[in-house]
Amino acid sequence: MSVNITQFNNYVAAGEFSVGVNTNENNNLLETITFVEEEHLTRLLGARLYNALQTDLAINNDGTATAQKWIDFINGVSYVDPSASDYTINYQGVFRMLKGFVFWQYISEHQYKRTSTGVRKLNAENSSMVDTQMTNALIRRKYNKSVDLYLCAQHFIDDYKTYEATASNIVESPATTYTVTISDTKYLANGDTVTIEGNEYTVANLVDDTSFEFTATTGLTFTDLTVSYEPFPDFKPVKPKYISFA
C-alpha cells in the first residue's frame, strides 16, 4: 500500500482545502487521498521514480521523506538555476499541489459540499445557476493552480537530471578501493552510480560533502576529476492538462 504525503487532517481543518467531511465520510476521503496522490505522482515522476519515492517514504511511514532529494521535492527548496547562475528559483514543493488535486477530486465526486465557507450544491434544486458557475470556477482554479505547481515540480527534477561536481583528488588505498575527496555531493547516496572519465562506478561509504569510495581495477589514474550523476534517474514525466473555463 502506498504511503500518502498529505494526511486526513489537511482536509478536515478549516482552511483553503477543507472539504467539510463528517465521520461517515472518512473512508471516502482517505480513498481519494490515496488514489489522487498515486495517480498524479506517478504521472509526474514516472512509475520507477514514483516507486523509489515510495521506498523512501516507507522508512518513516508517516508521509515524511528521509533522503534530502525527496525532502526538497516534497517541501520545496530555493536553489540556483543551473542555466542562469545569477537567478534563484524558489521551488514550492508538491504538498500544496497534492492538496489542490485531492480537493478538486473529492469535491467534484461529491458534487460539492464544504458549507460554512462557501462551496455548496449537494441539492441542485437549492442552487442557482450563478452559485453553480461560481463553484465550478472555484474548483477549476484550484485544479489549475495545482497543474502550475505540478509543472514546477517537473522543472525542479529536470534541473537535477544530471548533476556535476569536481573532486579535489581520487586516491587508491588500499588496492582496488578508491577514495574520492569532494566538497559537493548534493543528492548523492550510497548505491548511486557516478561517472568519471566516461566510466561508471558505484558509490559506497559516502560522507556528505566530504568523500565517497568506489571499487575498481587497481592502478587507475584520473586526470579529469569531474564527477557526474543522475539524482533522479528514470524520470519519465507526463505533462498535465489545464481545465478550460469555457
Tell where the protein language model's regions lie, with residue ranges:
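Conserved short "hinge" loops at termini or chain/domain junctions
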Residues: 1-95, 109-166, 177-181, 221-224, ...
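Small/polar beta-strand repeat architecture
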Residues: 165-190, 195-231
